[in-house]
Each structure stands twice: as C-alpha cells, then as structure tokens.
C-alpha cells in the first residue's frame, strides 16, 4: 500500500541519515574491497530473500537492508579516485553516469518482462547472480590500488 511504502521510505531516510557519515569512515578503516564485499554479499542474500519469501514483513526488512548497503557503493568512487589519473576522473564519471542512466531505462523493462513471462523470482535470482559476479571482481581492488600507488622513495 502507499502507506507501507511511505513508512519504508521514512525508515530508510532516517537510518541512512545516521549511517551515511559512518560509511565514509568505514571505507577509511577497512578499505573499499572489504566494504564492497559486504555490499555484494548482502545483495546476494537480499535478492535471494526477495525471490523466496512470501512474507510482506520480511520483504520490508530486506528492502531496508538493501537500501542501507546500496549506499556502500560510494566505495566504488573512492576506489576509482585512487587508481585514475586526475584528468581522467571527470570524463570517466560522466560516461559512467550516462551508462547508468541508460541502464536505468532498459534493466527495469527487461526485469518486468522476465517477471511477467517467467515469474517474479527470476529477476531477483539474476540480481543475486550478478551480485556474485561483482563480489568476485571486487577481490582484485587491493591489487589495483597497489599497482597504481605512487612509488615510495
């Protein structure tokens, strides 16, 4: 219902108002690889939960968890700033933003089609699988940071 969604939005905004400053400090403390590993591991569990739960309450809790860990993606930007040449940051971020906007149009349409044709579980299982791929890929982050770090004299 509209009331339920409104309450979920208010819960998310209140929680993230407190947690977002902690995310930056957490990146500094544990690093991008570990924080993104937590994000993608949690996303696997959340998407699998969405696909398998029959409870609206569980789905609501999963939504709040999903919203919290989605903000961990700031670690992608801090990682990029560590490995990119300064003159490449702005144009690369602009292209990434454009690609994200294009995906924001096509991915929901594809997900909706999969939902209608094959059941609501399929888009969430695909999301879990893609999160698994991302989890594997972020394991090379520390190596990339070391490769791009300035040499110490």
What residue spans do the PLM features occupy?
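Multi-pass alpha-helical transporter architecture, strongest
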Residues: 127-153
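Structural signature of the two symmetry-related core transmembrane helices
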Residues: 34-49, 125-128
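Intracellular juxtamembrane helix-capping segments at the cytosolic ends
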Residues: 71-84
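Loop-to-transmembrane helix entry/capping segments in MFS-fold secondary transporters
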Residues: 2-3, 86-96
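Helix-to-loop junctions at the C-terminal end of transmembrane segments
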Residues: 19-31, 115-116
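Residue-level signature of mid-helix packing/kink "hotspots" within the transmembrane helices
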Residues: 13-21, 71, 101-105, 109
């Amino acid at each position: 219902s509209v009331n339920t969604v409104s309450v979920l939005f208010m819960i998310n905004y209140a929680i993230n108002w407190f947690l977002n400053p902690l995310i930056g400090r957490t990146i500094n403390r544990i690093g991008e690889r570990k924080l993104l590993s937590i994000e993608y591991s949690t996303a696997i569990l959340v998407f699998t939960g969405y696909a398998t739960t029959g409870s609206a309450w569980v789905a609501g809790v999963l939504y709040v968890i999903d919203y919290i860990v989605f903000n961990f993606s700031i670690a992608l930007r801090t990682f990029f700033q560590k490995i990119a040449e300064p003159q490449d940051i702005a144009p690369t971020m602009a292209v990434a933003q454009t690609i994200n906007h294009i995906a924001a149009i096509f991915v929901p349409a594809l997900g909706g089609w999969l939902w209608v044709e094959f059941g609501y579980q399929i888009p969430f299982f695909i999301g879990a699988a893609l999160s698994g791929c991302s989890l594997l890929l972020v394991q090379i982050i520390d190596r990339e940071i070391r490769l791009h770090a300035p040499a110490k004299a």
